[in-house]
Amino acid sequence: AAPSEIDFRLGKIEHTRFPDGENYYRLLEAREIRNSPAVYVAGTVSDAAVMEMYNICSALVMEQCSSLHIVIPYFGYSTMERASRRGEVVIAKNIARLLSSLPTSARGNFVYMVDLHSLGTQYYFEGSIRPIHLTAEPLIRQMIADVGENPVLATADMGRAKWVQKMSGRLGLDSAYIMKQRLSGEQTEVVALNANVSGRRVVIYY
């Protein structure tokens, strides 16, 4: 929903990037922040985005917002929520720890995540910050309905297989699983498909 639909005013942030790569940020409505709840919406789509989130949210608390609400529609690195080999860095956990270290607003800090790849990610947050896991299932249901009659609900991510199976069961749809093999950090190969989707509309859920 847009800020106007939920009775929030959209704040403005001045951002300048210097030739050496350093960033300058300024909250242009700083005077309006004090004693008001602040909502920051962003995804952890890159390391730069994570640091930007941390810097701006820190500034919101320093300007004395009454409560801080971080909304993360897409939690990047969510497939790196545990180490499968010795020496691997669990980046999802480190992001959670970083956000947990934010200064705390008077009425607390909250982080909202949507359909996490692994539900365990929310338990990496520490201290007083409160993680809240949400689902976009109602929106996804509507999007599937708009596709047309009797589509196939599929996933190429085996971490989503159970979710897709449950959703397709509730909607009375067929499901499909695309088995893939990762060849490198940038290349994957499809090795199997467990359903016949020829001539049918397919909704792929990641």
Residue locations for each model-derived region?
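PRPP-associated nucleotide enzymes
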Residues: 1-206
